[in-house]
């Protein structure tokens, strides 16, 4: 089974999420860091590698919270949440041409179709609401 993973980075100091603008080859849509898990990698190892490739960043003390596991035929996509103290400036690779930190429910447009579906899934919204309410107490 093919697996991919993505991550919502949330800055506790600004209460904003990181989104990445994919390049022309990737349809100029906004998404989150992540990508394909390679053979021999664990889910977390693959997600860490993808973040370092795409952002040159992955927090050493990351506490990853699973948000969603989506299965479609021979493909599984895992979505995680990670609260960090402060925003950072990502050093983007050639897959992306921009980034933006935006507030909850203030998504940049157009969203990648897969991320659009994830964000609009009620269970995902409820999990994010619960996580944010715990953090913001």
Residue ranges of predicted features:
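Short intrinsically disordered terminal tails
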Residues: 1, 136-137
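Conserved N-terminal beta-strand and adjoining loop/helix that marks the start
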Residues: 1-18
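A generic structural motif
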Residues: 10-12, 22-23, 83
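Short, well-ordered strand-loop elements centered on a beta-strand within folded domains, enriched
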Residues: 14-21, 87-92
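Short beta-strand
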Residues: 21-22, 69
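A conserved beta-turn-beta hairpin within the catalytic core of GNAT-like acetyltransferases
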Residues: 25-28
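A short gly/proline-enriched turn/hairpin at secondary-structure junctions
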Residues: 31-32
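Unchanged
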Residues: 35-124, 135-136
């Amino acid at each position: 089974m093919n697996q991919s993973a993505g991550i919502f980075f949330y800055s506790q100091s600004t209460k904003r999420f990181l989104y990445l603008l994919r390049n022309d080859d990737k349809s100029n849509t906004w998404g989150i860091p992540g990508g394909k898990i390679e053979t021999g990698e664990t889910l977390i190892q693959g997600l860490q590698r993808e973040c370092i490739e795409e952002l040159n960043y992955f927090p050493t003390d990351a506490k990853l919270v699973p948000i969603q596991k989506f299965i479609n035929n021979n493909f599984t996509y895992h979505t995680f949440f990670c609260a960090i103290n402060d925003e950072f400036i990502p050093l983007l690779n050639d897959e992306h041409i921009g980034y933006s930190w935006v507030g909850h429910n203030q998504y940049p447009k157009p969203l990648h179709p897969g991320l659009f579906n994830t964000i609009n899934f009620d269970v995902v919204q409820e999990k994010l609401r619960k996580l944010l309410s715990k953090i913001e107490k």
